[in-house]
Amino acid sequence: MNHKGPYMRKNITIGTTLRRISLILFCLLPLKGICQTGEATVDALVKMGFENVGWTEDTEERVFVIQNSAYRLEGVGIGKAVDLIQKMGLPENKPCRLIVLDNNVPQISLYYQPMKGDSIAEVSRADWSVSYDLGEGWKQARRIKKQNSSLFKVDIVVYPELLFRNYILSKVYEIVVNVSPAIEVSLWKGMKLTGQVIFPIYNDYGQRYKQIRPGFVTLSQTVRLPQRTFMTASVGFFNKFRWGGDLKAKHFFKDERFSVDARIGYTGRGYFEDWAFYHGTKWTLTGSIGANFYWPKYNTQFSLKGERYLEGEYGARFDMIRHFRYASIG
């Protein structure tokens, strides 16, 4: 089962986010910074459109917390935040950490460690390291009051959709083109409600695809577990006329080039016709388990998975994806 849809945040996975941020951090001329408190920086980040913004500081380090909603590409947004933090001023003689959230769930941290005896007058993005480790400062940062909360805000996202198949000899391809706007609402930490409507533009697939109908209608809860592990549970109506539940998890090892993931779904067939919902009685168990490797020299991701499909068949899948700044090819 392949539930790729609007509940995946801005079409960007956690692993892709880390790689794109890492790439952008090495593409900046030096910026000057002077030591200030974090209040002015927080205010400036809020004015830029970032959500869930806060800061804290102790004798060990200064920590900023943000969630990107101002920029379409996650890596570009985080790069802009790093620029601003450097411009507003880094702490003197102590590290600075930027923790990035998604729906209030911490994802990654960017860490700047000043060298002993070195001046902070010239600091660039390349001086920040990126990791899934959040550091000890997160224990304090998670309790601070954040500005510009994302809770109960409604995001509107429009997804174009192109489907094609080769089933008949008299036609090379049958094609479906849809435009599918969706709303996404953050209900509490990690919880998201997604509602989508599909508007057909062109259809060769038959009567069922000609109707304006609901797309993804889901409730999803994401949590971050200890040791760089993420888990998401979703229930609702998915793609491929499937409805039911889905659970996925991903763990990054200490060497963050390596990760493992697993997914299990329990769904039945259901569809809308004239806005009435019809469903069958057969439920199907699907799933996958796999391992991943990221090659930073070439910004390339490799993954190998074993999968169980809707008809009860088993198979293996290998992917190789090269990531660029604004696109991925694989």
Regions flagged by a language model, labelled:
Residues F26-I34:
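Hydrophobic h-region of N-terminal signal peptides that target proteins for export
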Residues Q36-T218, G280:
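Outer-membrane beta-barrel initiation region
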Residues S170, G206-Y209, G244-K248, E273-Y278, ...:
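Outer-membrane beta-barrel translocator domains and adjoining extracellular loop/strand segments
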Residues N2-Y7:
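Short, Lys/Arg-enriched N-terminal segments with co-localized hydrophobic residues
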Residues V177-L187, I212-L225, G244-I264, L285-W295, ...:
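Feature captures outer-membrane beta-barrel proteins of Gram-negative bacteria and organelles
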Residues D255, W275-F277, K297-N299:
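Short helix-loop boundary/capping segments
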Residues R9-S22:
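Bacterial N-terminal signal peptides that target proteins for export
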Residues V65-N68, I156-I168, L193-I201, P226-F238, ...:
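Transmembrane beta-strand segments that form the barrel wall of outer-membrane beta-barrel proteins
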